[in-house]
Amino acid sequence: MGKIRHIAITAEDPFVTAELFKKALGLQEISRGDSELAREVYLTDGYINLAIVCWKRTKETPNPYPDGYGLDHFGVHVEDLESAEAKARKAGATSQPPPPVDLSKLAGNTLYFEKKLTLAGIKFDLSGHGWATQKEE
């Protein structure tokens, strides 16, 4: 069975939003970044991570949030990536279209997902190795 380990939301100011969630819920910060593509903060409760991201407006992506801010996707840690993907596809999941940006250029995050899928209009990631739940020393 897959386990939800990552939830990603978008916010106008991820740095301010992260401070609010840290104060309100006692979440711990794992990392943050400010690259040419996005401002981002990664929080955790030690079990599930919360990614708070704001993609920057670029020539290629002048309006990254046509529908506003909020839930973007969730990530599931699975034991067997291939069988989990096959099971999801059998249920109707399809590949997400490629993002409009090169995610490898993000400053504050290692790319933990291995498969990006959509099911019933909801985006989710699958990962066989999971997400970091503590700050790297």
Language model feature labels by segment:
Residues 44, 65-68:
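A generic structural micro-feature
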Residues 59-61:
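A cross-kingdom feature marking solvent-exposed beta-strand/loop segments within repeated
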Residues 16, 81-86:
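Short, conserved charged micro-motifs
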Residues 51-53, 125:
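Conserved beta-strand in the GNAT
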Residues 2, 9-50, 90, 98, ...:
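Core segments of cupin and vicinal oxygen chelate
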Residues 1-18, 71-78, 127-137:
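N-terminal beta-strand motif that seeds the catalytic metal site of vicinal oxygen chelate
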Residues 76, 85-137:
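Vicinal oxygen chelate
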